[in-house]
Structures are given as C-alpha cells and as structure tokens.
C-alpha cells in the first residue's frame, strides 16, 4: 500500500504508466494449509481492484500477475517460523502439481505493459483454477480440498 501511494507522483508524471502488483493464485482460489498467505494475497487483489478505479483518472493502469507455484526460494522453506513446519515445501508441491519456472513470471511482468487485463493468472494450472473459480467455485473448493487434504491443521 505504501509503495503504491509513494510511487503515485512518479506514475502521474509518466506517460502510459502501469502499476503492477504481484499477487498469487492463492489470492484467487482457496489454499488450504496456508490460509494467512492466501488472505494477504486476497488483500493484494482487493487493493489492485480499488487502485485501478482510483488511479484511472490519472491515466495509470493498475493490474496484477497471479503466479501458480513458482520455482523460487519460498518453496525451499522447511520452516514457517521457529515452531511451525511449512506444509508447502517443494517436495510436497511437486507431488501434487507442476511448478512453473521463474522465467514465466518475468515474462508476465514484461508483457503486462501491453496486457489490459486486471488479473493475470499464469500457466495452464493458474488459468484453469482462476477460470473455474469464477465459473464454478464449488468445483475448485472441492478439488483444492482433495488435492491438499493433508495440509489441514489437526
């Protein structure tokens, strides 16, 4: 939030400005086992929606990219904190779905300048999940529950 507002002056004075937020598919579809992470990404989605309307009067386009699981250091984490193990490490994710290369995110950032959509899910899985979450949310909740059933807290 602070970064977006801090950059507003610069964006207002730059022709064809684009403010791009990095969200996550976890902000569009349920992510059991990482509820707080999903909630923060859902907040980024809400911020993006609101800023898109607010900044439109300055001719600043606001959008976001929504990566699927991406091969970054976050998947290497075995611990979320000193006393909590990460339920979503690379091995866990690899057993359930495809992990996208980081280059896919870099390309999406580059392409976002000409892409006019507000939400930009990446990869086949991300686009599939996002599409069906809008079309049939109960299906995605069912699939998410089955796919990640062993991440629920006991």
Model-predicted segments: where are they?
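Active-site helix of classical SDR
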Residues: 4, 40
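Alpha-helical segment proximal to the catalytic Tyr-Lys
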Residues: 9, 53-56
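Residue(s) in the substrate-gating loop at a strand-loop-helix junction
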Residues: 24
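Conserved catalytic-site region of short-chain dehydrogenase/reductase
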Residues: 27-29
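Active-site loop immediately N-terminal to the catalytic Tyr-X3-Lys motif
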Residues: 31-35
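Catalytic tyrosine of NAD(P)H-dependent dehydrogenase/reductases that use a Tyr as the general acid/base
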Residues: 37, 45
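SDR active-site lid
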Residues: 57-124
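A transmembrane-helix-recognition feature enriched in membrane-embedded lipid enzymes
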Residues: 116-151
């Amino acid at each position: 939030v602070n970064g977006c507002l801090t950059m507003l002056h610069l964006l207002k004075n730059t022709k064809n400005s684009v403010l791009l937020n990095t969200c996550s598919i976890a902000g569009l579809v349920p992510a059991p086992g990482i509820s707080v992470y999903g909630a923060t990404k859902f907040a980024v989605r809400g911020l993006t929606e609101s800023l898109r309307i607010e900044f439109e009067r300055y001719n600043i386009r606001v959008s976001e990219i929504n990566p699927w699981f991406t091969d970054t250091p976050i998947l290497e984490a075995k611990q979320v904190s000193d006393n909590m193990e990460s339920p979503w490490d690379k091995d866990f994710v690899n057993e359930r779905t495809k992990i996208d290369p980081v280059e896919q995110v870099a390309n999406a950032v580059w392409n976002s300048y000409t892409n006019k959509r507000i939400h930009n899910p990446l990869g086949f899985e991300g686009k599939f999940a996002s599409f069906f979450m809008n079309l049939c949310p109960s299906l995605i909740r069912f699939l998410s529950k089955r796919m990640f059933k062993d991440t629920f807290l006991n």
